[in-house]
Amino acid sequence: MALNLDMSFLTSDVVKANLLPGLYYSLQLTVVTMVCGVILGTLIALMRLSSKPWLQRIAAVYVDTLRSIPLLMVILWFYLLIPAGFYSFIAGGYGLAHRPEFSAVITFTIFEAAYYSEIMRAGIQSVPRGQVYAGYAVGMTYSQCMRLVVLPQAFRNMLPVLLTQTIVLFQDTSLVYAIGAYDFLKGFLTAGQIYNRPDEVLLPAAACYFVISFSLSMLVRRLQKKIAIIR
């Protein structure tokens, strides 16, 4: 059976009604997860660099476990296997209990934090120890030294890598389609179902993901060059 690639159904009305809401959610999920994931990942990185062995072990198990499990499996696990009462306890008062959008934010934050933590750990270790000792010499505590001296430099040094991981995160958001969240891919597939074009939508969907990801990659590359010049 020949494939009839008729894209005429992708009118401005279809884009406005189906694709833009999905794109908005995918970008929203990416940004929220990036912010929460970097914060949680930084805490995990500090745990791995802690002088307390038990903190190191907890952080190591967290990172190694999540990096060894496929993301789709984690998404399904958090959405299907975590008891509904857990979500009700956290967000029942806000009407968010067991919604795929809420589950996706929790899942991606926990999962991506494992990757962001390794990036931040490398960034922290890239800061010369002499600056830490200089902070101690002027009377700073460990937390002050980390907050005012080490972490700002680590974040700046690793910003291109953090943003590159965020691009991967944006691509991974297409997996939330599996739990019914209305993301960018879901918007394309919905339009394909409405206009009986289930096959044709895959090509423009892939093209849109490519254009967005490639454009962001070029911006990250330019940022990387600017950071190198500042150094």
Annotate each predicted stretch with a short phrase.
Residues 1-231:
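Transmembrane alpha-helices and adjacent helix-loop boundaries
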